[in-house]
From Swiss-Prot:
Subcellular location: Cytoplasm
Catalytic activity: dTTP + H2O = dTMP + diphosphate + H(+); UTP + H2O = UMP + diphosphate + H(+)
GO biological process, one term: nucleotide metabolic process
Record organism: Leptospira biflexa serovar Patoc (strain Patoc 1 / ATCC 23582 / Paris)
Record-level Gene Ontology MF annotations: dTTP diphosphatase activity; UTP diphosphatase activity
CDD domains from the UniProt entry: Maf
Lineage summary: Bacteria, Pseudomonadati, Spirochaetota, Spirochaetia, Leptospirales
Name the UniProt record assigns to this protein: dTTP/UTP pyrophosphatase
Family: Belongs to the Maf family. YhdE subfamily.
TM annotation in the entry: none
UniProt cross-references to Pfam families, sorted A to Z: Maf
Length: 191
């Protein structure tokens, strides 16, 4: 069985669209950043924490996390409307990076991987930022935005679209030998 250790609706949808039969079993963890912890150190620690310690040999476990980084600082999920405005104002008209990391736990061990996507934002005024927040309610999204949002702030990107949605799909697919059995099992049951 394939166990997704995440409550993210976007990760769930990406994997469902690929044909996975998922068991959703998120870990509830402290997502506080440690003092002097770099963004990539934080990302890896979060992914491994979300993976948890449970392991059943017939299962493949997947955990993931996404961070938005500007000037080597993580812009976390906003806590309220004012925080979302603050974050979007910082990013307006500028470039930043989105990192999504994931870990697969399988019978032979655990493998961690991540991807980076470069994002260029539109230069929005205060009114445009407030309208976007009202329209999109980006409170569950790192960086206060979704690349998939209509009339959103993303002007351009270099890298993976699904990475910005919260899942490093290219890296995941390149490790197909780790999860192909779970996927084939699902396909066989459909026939």
């Amino acid at each position: 069985m394939f166990v997704l250790k995440s409550a993210s609706p976007r990760r769930k949808q990406i994997l469902f669209d690929l044909g996975f039969d998922l068991k959703i079993d998120p870990e509830h963890i402290d997502e506080s950043q440690k003092e002097l912890e770099s963004p990539l150190e934080y990302l890896e620690r979060m992914v491994h924490s979300k993976l948890g310690t449970l392991f059943e040999p017939n299962n493949v476990y997947l955990a993931a996390d996404t961070i938005v980084v500007y000037q080597n600082q993580i812009l976390h999920k906003p806590i309220d409307t004012n925080d979302a405005f603050r974050i979007l104002k910082i990013l307006s008209g500028k470039n930043h990076s989105v990192f999504s990391g994931a870990a697969l736990r399988h019978p032979n061990g655990t493998e961690y991987f991540y991807e980076e996507t470069m994002i260029g934002f539109q230069n929005w005024n205060d009114f445009e930022i407030n309208e976007y927040i009202k329209r999109s309610k980006p409170f569950d999204k790192a960086g206060s935005y979704g690349i998939q949002d209509k009339e959103g702030p993303v002007l351009q990107w270099i890298g993976s679209y699904t990475n910005v949605m919260g899942f490093p799909l290219r890296s995941f697919l390149s490790r197909h030998e780790l999860w192909i059995g779970s996927w084939e099992e699902r396909i066989m049951r459909r026939d």
